[in-house]
């Protein structure tokens, strides 16, 4: 079965989006499928029209010309979608694709719908988050603005007309049902982890010495510093944590839009380490130093609906997870068993729970063991990828039945 995955961006760019995509594609290949990839103009890391990465063909779409169109509402988006439609059809024909699997955002999904309809092949549309909500957090437009409502309406249209839809969590699936999307046409394939890659490892003493870690409990976060991650709360809380746990350390690994603001907030503090972005092959060494993996996401529509990947990676590595009680975390974490939740945006509760975990190594070990067990049993990509195999088969069978039904009785 030839599957064309349409992505916003991919490896070698590193993000939660690209890591999920990579995991899905490699797991599908292991199941005997033939996945190939097409990325949008937003992927700017490659200049070749096609490259081979880990045995997978990645087709690229060149960057759009800078002509000022992007400054006009909807014009830049329309230009990108027309470009993507041409490229999707070109690659789908070249690769003899049996099915198109488009991943959010909407700017991929609508062109994929046009092409799938034209080529008479099934389309699966997968939403990692709702594009309009992510755009609000990034400041692209305001909630309930005209652009928000248009984006919301167009994606609802897409969900209703795709052959099958996929979300990463149950909250998103329920949201689509409220929009009038048939619940049976939506499957949940949650975030997963490569459990062979992410597993408990010994502390990297060389790196600990290099960073000057003093043997006390290490609170950590590994990922992109987006505003919705709420990292300012752990930075603001840390002096209060250090007042009770003087040898505690906060290790922030990564970078992004909030990096400079966080560094300024921590400028007068002790025990806060910013590593910047680190090469992917060294990320596990930094994970090995963390005792308590902190996920202090803010409370907003995006975080209430969407389940993140990072807590699962921490669980897979046997770390104690401390996360805010937003909906996305509550769908992942069994409070007190596979992690601990604190009241979102509450410095006092974050400090209280942090001190409790820092003072109780046995509890941390218990949470880490249970978290690892949960990931191995329920969130390994080896198991999750089989859901795609079934829904692809269903979509192809439905397409064949539709084609057969359109044939006049006299010709059957």
Language-model features, listed with the residues they occupy:
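N-terminal subdomain of nucleotide-sugar transferases
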Residues: 1-62, 241, 400, 404, ...
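Conserved donor-binding/catalytic core segment of Leloir-type glycosyltransferases
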Residues: 4-6, 213-238
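A short helix/loop element that forms part of the nucleotide-sugar donor recognition site in Leloir-type
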Residues: 50, 199-213
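Acidic donor-binding loop of glycosyltransferase active sites
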Residues: 95-99, 163, 288-304, 319-320
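Carbohydrate-associated surface elements
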Residues: 171, 192
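Nucleotide-activated donor-binding/catalytic signature segment of Leloir-type glycosyltransferases, i.e.
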Residues: 260-284
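Short hydrophobic beta-strand element within catalytic cores of glycosyltransferases
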Residues: 295, 313-316, 320-323, 333
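Conserved acidic donor-binding segment of nucleotide-sugar-dependent glycosyltransferases
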Residues: 334-336, 340-347, 356-362, 377
């Amino acid at each position: 079965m030839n599957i064309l995955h349409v992505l916003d961006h991919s490896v070698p760019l590193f993000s939660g989006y690209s890591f999920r995509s990579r995991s899905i594609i490699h797991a599908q290949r292991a199941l005997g499928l033939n996945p190939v990839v097409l990325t949008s103009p937003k992927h700017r890391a490659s200049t070749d029209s096609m490259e081979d990465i880990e045995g997978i063909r990645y087709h690229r779409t060149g960057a759009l010309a800078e002509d000022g169109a992007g400054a006009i509402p909807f014009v830049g988006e329309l230009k990108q979608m027309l470009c993507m439609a041409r490229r999707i059809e070109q690659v789908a024909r070249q690769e003899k694709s049996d099915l198109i699997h488009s991943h959010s955002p909407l700017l991929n999904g609508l062109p994929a719908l046009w092409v799938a309809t034209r080529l008479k092949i099934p389309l699966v549309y997968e939403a990692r988050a709702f594009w309009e909500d992510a755009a609000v957090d990034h400041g692209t437009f305001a909630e309930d603005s005209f652009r928000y409502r248009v984006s919301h309406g167009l994606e609802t249209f897409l969900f209703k007309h795709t052959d099958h839809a996929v979300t990463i969590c149950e909250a998103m699936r329920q949201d689509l049902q409220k929009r009038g999307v048939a619940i049976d046409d939506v499957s949940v394939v949650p975030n997963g982890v490569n459990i062979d890659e992410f597993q408990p490892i010994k502390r990297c003493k060389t790196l600990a010495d290099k960073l000057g870690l003093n043997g006390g409990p290490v609170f950590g976060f590994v990922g992109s510093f987006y505003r919705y991650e709420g990292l300012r709360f752990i930075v603001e809380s840390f002096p209060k944590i250090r007042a009770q746990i003087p040898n505690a350390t906060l290790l922030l690994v990564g970078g992004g839009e909030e990096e400079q603001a966080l560094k300024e907030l921590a400028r007068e503090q002790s025990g806060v380490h910013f590593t910047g972005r680190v090469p992917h092959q060294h990320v596990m060494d930094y994970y090995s130093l963390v005792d308590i993996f902190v996920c202090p996401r803010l409370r907003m529509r995006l975080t209430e609906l969407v389940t993140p990947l990072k807590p699962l990676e921490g669980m897979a590595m046997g770390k104690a997870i401390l996360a805010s009680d937003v909906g996305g975390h509550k769908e992942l974490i069994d409070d007190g068993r596979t992690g601990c939740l604190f009241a979102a945006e509450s410095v006092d509760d974050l400090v209280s729970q942090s001190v409790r975990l820092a003072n109780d190594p046995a509890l941390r070990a218990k949470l880490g063991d249970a978290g690892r067990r949960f990931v191995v049993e329920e969130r390994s990509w080896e198991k999750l990828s089989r859901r795609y195999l079934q829904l692809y088969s269903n979509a192809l069978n439905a397409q064949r039945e539709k084609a057969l039904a359109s044939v006049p009785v006299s010709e059957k």
